[in-house]
Amino acid sequence: MIRSHVDVVGSLLRPAELLAAQKKFAAGELQPADFKKIEDRAVDQAVTLQEEAGLEIVTDGEMRRQSFQAQMTAAVDGFGEHTLDAFLWGQWHGDQATGDWSLARPVALGVVGKLRRRRHLSAEEFTYLRARTRCIAKITLPSPSLWVNFWSRQHSSHAYPTLESFLADVTEILCEEVAELARLGATYIQMDAPHYALLIDPATQGFYEQQAAQGGHSASVQQWLDRALELDNAVISAAPAVTIGLHLCRGSQASRWLAEVSYEPIAPTVFRKNSRLTGFCLTTMMCARDHSNHCGRFPTISWWYLA
């Protein structure tokens, strides 16, 4: 018997009140306590929406984040000044209604100092969410190797001479975060890895090869993938009792997508080397490229979610 499994994988749309408040807060026109109340209301609305839809697992809609991975840069010193473009750059593909859209990688993007955590990334998100629902509260965290984007030989080498040394500190912070969430009672964490599809897309894989070369070593796509999965497994091992789901997608922003490839080339490695995972969340709706049966690559996995 197949049991259906439904939960929210990405961010929910921010309500107009929150969008307006974010602008006012950034401009210094709104006090932190007042801004927090508006964020809280947005989370409450997101929880109600999911509960009324009958979901057994709910998120806070990532209402408190600039982007799905931005809780890292918000809680950790060393990333330097950056805008939302740091998370959105790339060649985005669209359909006839949305069209393509391009954004160059910011030239100043790059970690500028040793990473130092000022506070936990998602502990506050989790404790607030847990207090607002009787459902399972899910928190999302980024895969460590997603942060390859934030290393630059020009801007980062004085703090992190190699890309590997930077990723080691990122991984340590995420391990500490998973352990703290488990201590607080979290039972389900989603690890977001949209960059895995970019590793095999001919239009984007060159960036990762270039980052490796500038970071002190050469790396093929397979070597990149193997190392990325090692870092994932390190984070997962920080809380063995917590359910971890790996989310793969091709990027999703304003009904556009970044990668246009099948998961097939990476399926054997991803599905078999992430042996500590409980499940996978595979987003397939943005670009219909997947006709093969990926689930057959790893028949012992507890559950799959196909969006």
Q: In which residue ranges do the predicted regions lie?
A:
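Domain-level signal for soluble alpha/beta catalytic cores
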Residues: 1-307
